[in-house]
């Protein structure tokens, strides 16, 4: 289970589309729980994702989302290939009590945390026994009155944090514009604040091109420069074509 969180517009959905595309490329099944009301099939194709082949769940509330996720996983064939379950997003999924309470109701936040705490225990068993890679997309909130340390937090209580084997914090980096001031791409910083699969606190920088998707070549070259694998004598990608060829790098992977 991986939790992916950032502020609005951080690039989370672009990562979801990329993972769906890779899952489909491997012959797997992608399940998308969508509560953001922001599906964009054309945008998804940029990342190689075919939303028509996705098992789409559009629940009205969190209780329905959890029930339908369990049902979808149980209905999959036992010999199914890689299975991706992406929830976009947890923060945008209200509970029944939140919907009933309306704008001025109280007690809904605590009820949400308790519900998620129970649900995480169930989801953990379902995912671990079904060879499912689960991605939970979340948003950051600012804690009031924090004088020292990181003032940001994620909604949902501690349940998702404990359940996740990997927690990735996404933050924005440098924006890249064209000759006429058009936004062409941006750098995205990914910080592993929790990692049961390896050393924690590792960081990386990737580039998101708004027209072509994630720029894998640039990311590999930038990593090579930072680790002194490549000499930063030239800023152009073309200068490293021979290095990429020697690494047997394939841009589609």
Q: What function would you assign to each model-found segment?
A:
Residues 1-54, 70-74:
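The Walker A/P-loop phosphate-binding site
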Residues 25, 46-54, 101-109, 151-157:
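A short alpha->loop->secondary-structure connector
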Residues 35-37, 59-61, 89-90, 139-140, ...:
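Short, ordered loop/turn segments at secondary-structure junctions
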Residues 60-132:
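Phosphate-binding/switch loop-helix module in NTP-utilizing enzymes
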Residues 92, 98, 142-147, 231-237:
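N-terminal cationic and glycine-rich segments that engage phosphates or anionic surfaces
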Residues 109-227:
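Phosphate-binding/switch region of NTP-binding enzymes
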Residues 232-253:
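Terminal-proximal interaction/regulatory segments of ATP-powered molecular machines
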């Amino acid at each position: 289970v991986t939790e992916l969180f950032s502020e609005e517009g951080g690039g989370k959905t672009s990562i979801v589309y990329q993972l769906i595309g890779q899952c489909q490329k491997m012959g797997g099944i992608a399940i998308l729980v969508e509560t953001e009301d922001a599906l964009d099939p054309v945008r998804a194709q940029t990342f190689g994702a075919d939303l028509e082949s996705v098992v789409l769940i559009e629940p009205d509330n969190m209780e329905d989302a959890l029930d339908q996720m369990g049902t979808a996983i149980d209905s999959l064939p036992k010999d199914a290939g890689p299975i991706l379950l992406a929830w976009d997003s947890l923060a945008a999924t209200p509970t029944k009590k939140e919907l009933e309470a309306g704008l001025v109701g109280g007690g809904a936040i605590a009820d949400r945390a308790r519900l998620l705490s129970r649900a995480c225990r169930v989801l953990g068993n379902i995912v671990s026994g079904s060879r499912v890679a689960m991605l939970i997309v979340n948003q950051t909130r600012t804690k009031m009155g924090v004088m020292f340390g990181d003032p940001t937090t994620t909604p949902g209580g501690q349940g998702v944090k404990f359940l996740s084997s990997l927690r990735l914090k996404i933050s924005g980096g440098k924006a890249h514009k064209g000759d006429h001031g058009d936004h062409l791409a941006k750098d995205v910083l990914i910080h592993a604040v929790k990692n049961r699969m390896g050393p924690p606190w590792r960081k990386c920088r990737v580039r998101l091109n708004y027209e072509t998707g994630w720029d894998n070549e640039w990311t590999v070259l930038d990593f090579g420069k930072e680790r002194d694998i490549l000499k930063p004598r030239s800023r152009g990608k073309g200068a490293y074509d021979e290095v990429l060829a020697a690494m047997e790098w394939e841009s589609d992977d």
